[in-house]
């Protein structure tokens, strides 16, 4: 049985980062809503309480009874989690005189405390809170302070319960990983035995037990997630897996043909379906982004339903859903941020059970699994691409001509990123493509005046988008070389009929999302 850390999510934007940091310690963890602790799970070895956008004294704040957890498992509260435990045990939490956001340094701390083992003196930590603990209960002790925060960290005396008002999961906390290692490995006893290989071994065994001799259909998109899911399932159930790759007409240039070839080389049983005319017809005149996503999602259901009925006795629908898909589709408060193609809707109409073997993995973990499975590097390192394809990179309504323009521009941009060689941090040669997390071109709903030769033009503008990230939860715009952008801009304007202006998007996430729609 795989031991795990449970992270109780109180709605923090950095909850996913906590999970990533724990998994980087080769220890498995799961995030569950703050009020859904799995009390009957014998594999739990420790609990982390996340931050929250609420104040602990707000009537609407998320609150939970920890009496059945405390004393049974080691607990680490982060930010709100720390404030919540202090407040509910009789401590005081009040609005800070000055809001604490950004860098701070540990001015005093108990170096003998197991949570702070090997944490350096004056180590930088990252603060992000508007409230602060002003008094702790009698059975609590302060174990760290900063210049402005007297109670930066505490421990409940004689208990394996700690709280920190800073964020060890954030990169800017210099010894944050060490602190988390102290908790996960030394205090909770984590064996650090979770890896891509162990995930494959466990998941294949679970899939065999779950699926038995049932037949499964899986929707391939050409992306990393569905491809790795397919190879993993193929390893578990072989010929009982049938993959369906639908061309909705909004794939990248030549993608349908190239991806089908890749899948055949992997030994997958794949059916390719050209449904482009159906999608173009149903999307005609539709401009609103969410409507476009819904139409494409429904279109996939229709095509899948038709193809699945041609296969006898199919019982399961498999998808390449990963963690960020689930988090962006539904927040802890139930507010829809953006509908994801992979989340919701499909199994209900098709009357199939749902299988999502990668649902609890982050993107980089999916790639590690793909490498462990022996998949070719060009498939594993492909940039993320939205399920609705170029439809959400065309602002406004969709037409075959707009798709043609965007395909041509995108092909020039992506190939340019692949061809432009640079040195990585270790001095090894790589390409710009492998230095960015995701890139693409957006066709803007505007036209602008230009001059080509001696003639005035009035043609479309496109925006280039490239971001750096590790998990898609946050992202920064990529600082591409000016020489590269000048070349790509020139190539697009000269080679793509209908475009006379190229812009570059320098928005980070948040506040923007990676995709424009």
From Swiss-Prot:
ATP binds at residues 221-227. Transmembrane segments: none annotated. The active site is at residues 79, 167, 169. One of its GO terms (cellular component) is cytosol. Residues 194-382 form the GMPS ATP-PPase domain. Residues 4-193 form the Glutamine amidotransferase type-1 domain. Pfam families: GATase, GMP_synt_C, NAD_synthase. Its EC number is 6.3.5.2. This is GMP synthase [glutamine-hydrolyzing].
């Amino acid at each position: 049985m795989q031991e795990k850390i449970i992270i109780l999510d109180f709605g923090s934007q950095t909850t996913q980062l906590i999970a990533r940091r724990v998994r980087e310690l080769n220890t498995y963890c799961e995030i569950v809503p703050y009020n859904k602790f799995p009390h009957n799970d014998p594999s739990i070895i420790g609990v982390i309480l996340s931050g929250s956008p609420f104040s602990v004294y707000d009537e609407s704040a998320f609150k939970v009874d920890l009496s059945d957890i405390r004393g049974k498992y080691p607990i680490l509260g982060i930010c709100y989690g720390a404030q919540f435990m202090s407040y509910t045990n009789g401590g005081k939490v009040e609005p800070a005189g000055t809001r604490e956001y950004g860098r701070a340094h540990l001015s005093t701390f108990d170096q003998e405390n197991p949570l702070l083992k090997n944490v350096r003196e004056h180590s930088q930590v990252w603060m992000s809170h508007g409230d602060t603990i002003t008094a702790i209960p009698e059975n609590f002790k302060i174990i760290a302070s900063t210049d402005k925060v007297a109670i930066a960290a505490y421990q409940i005396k004689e208990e394996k319960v700690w709280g920190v008002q800073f964020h060890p999961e954030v990169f800017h906390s210099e010894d944050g990983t060490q602190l988390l290692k102290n908790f996960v490995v030394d205090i909770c006893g984590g064996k650090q035995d979770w890896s891509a290989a162990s995930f494959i071994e466990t998941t294949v065994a679970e899939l065999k037990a779950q699926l038995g001799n049932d037949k499964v259909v899986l929707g391939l998109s050409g992306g990393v997630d569905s491809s790795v899911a397919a190879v993993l399932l193929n390893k578990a159930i072989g010929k009982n897996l049938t993959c369906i790759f639908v061309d909705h007409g909004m794939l990248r240039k030549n993608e349908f043909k190239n991806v089908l070839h890749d899948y055949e080389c992997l030994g997958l049983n794949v059916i390719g379906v050209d449904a482009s005319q159906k999608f173009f017809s149903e999307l005609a005149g539709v401009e609103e982004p969410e409507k476009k996503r819904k139409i494409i999602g429904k279109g996939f259901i229709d095509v899948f339903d038709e193809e699945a009925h041609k296969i006898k006795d199919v019982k399961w629908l498999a998808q390449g859903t990963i963690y960020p898909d689930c988090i962006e589709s539904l927040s802890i408060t139930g507010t829809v941020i953006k509908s994801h193609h992979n989340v919701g809707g499909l199994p209900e109409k098709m009357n199939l059970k749902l299988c999502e073997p990668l649902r609890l993995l982050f993107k980089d973990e999916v790639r590690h699994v793909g490498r462990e499975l022996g998949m070719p590097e060009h498939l594993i390192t492909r940039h993320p691409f939205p399920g609705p394809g170029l439809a959400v990179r065309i602002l406004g309504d969709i037409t075959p001509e707009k798709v043609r323009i965007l395909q041509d521009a995108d092909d020039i941009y992506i190939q340019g990123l692949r061809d432009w060689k640079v040195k990585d941090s270790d001095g090894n040669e790589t390409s710009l493509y492998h230095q960015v997390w995701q890139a693409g071109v957006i066709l803007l709903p505007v036209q602008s005046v230009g001059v080509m030769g001696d003639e005035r033009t009035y043609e479309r503008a496109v925006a280039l988008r490239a971001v750096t990230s590790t998990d898609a939860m946050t992202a920064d715009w990529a600082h591409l070389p000016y020489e590269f952008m000048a070349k790509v801009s020139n190539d697009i304007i000269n080679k793509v009929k209908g475009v006379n202006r190229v812009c570059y998007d320098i928005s980070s996430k948040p506040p923007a999302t990676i995709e424009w729609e």
